[in-house]
């Protein structure tokens, strides 16, 4: 398959990913097919975001690493010493993707390290390995292009997380601002009583202790529930089961208390 055709396959992977959750496993599989090597997409902290195996490496430590989806801390840290593509590293390199305890089995094993960079920062590393054949210039062009595509997707995922975070916070702030003073007071007491993200409470007991009517508590809970911040379920005589759905809610409530 010609270089141009392989580049188009990577392009189509990028186009297919538009607007969908990032799937690093599919990306790794595509790169495996066009570069014909084992592919590992590793985050800054060594988390294995995606991988695809072209040539099996029989080793218990490697198997566990793939199951845990985590590269060793020391190895991950060392990857930051590789600022640009470093190709065809042998089994004796500290960056080898082969298990050094089986050095004799993988004497011809070659590793290529490609930094994943986006927005001017190091986002992770693309690691490629082969049992023997050298990585040529075409392979390196595809690997670097693949790393660029992966970097774009990591940035997109980050942007979506930031957006979701901002949306969650805005929903909570709107829900809290819709509460009257007595309703807000009731909510503060309810979540002091719960002491966590979910639990059971008896509204009448809180109402009596704080000196507010039960209807104030019910109204406050309804407002938060309609905003999607909590869910509540009546368990009859036992009380009301409450669960926080928006993880920004308790933080915002705590912030209000400290002001």
From Swiss-Prot:
Residues annotated to bind L-isoleucine: 61, 96, 98, 100
UniProt modified residues of type Phosphoserine: 215
Variant or mutagenesis effect after changing residue 3 to S: Is predominantly monomeric. Retains the capacity to bind to DNA and repress transcription in vivo, even though its activity is considerably lower than that of the wild-type strain
Resulting phenotype, residue 71 to A: Retains 72% of ilvB repressing activity in a BCAA-containing medium
Effect on the protein upon substituting residue 61 to E: Nearly complete loss of ilvB repressing activity in a BCAA-containing medium
Effect of residue 61 to A: Retains some ilvB repressing activity in a BCAA-containing medium. Retains the ability to respond to GTP, but responds poorly to branched-chain amino acids unless GTP is simultaneously present
Activity regulation (UniProt): Activity of CodY is modulated by interaction with two types of effectors: the branched-chain amino acids (BCAAs) leucine, isoleucine and valine, which are signals of the nutritional status of the cell, and GTP, which may signal the energetic status of the cell. During growth in a nutrient-rich medium, the concentrations of these effectors are high, and CodY, once activated by binding to these effectors, shows an increased affinity for its target promoters. GTP and the BCAAs act additively to increase the affinity of CodY for DNA.
DNA-binding stretch(es), residue numbering of this chain: 203-222
Name of the protein in question: Global transcriptional regulator CodY
Result when mutating residue 214 to E: Does not bind the ilvB and dpp promoters
Listed NCBIfam families: codY_Gpos, PRK04158.1
GO cellular component: cytoplasm; protein-DNA complex
Natural source organism: Bacillus subtilis (strain 168)
Residue numbers binding L-valine: 61, 98, 100
This protein's encoding gene: codY
Similarity annotation: Belongs to the CodY family.
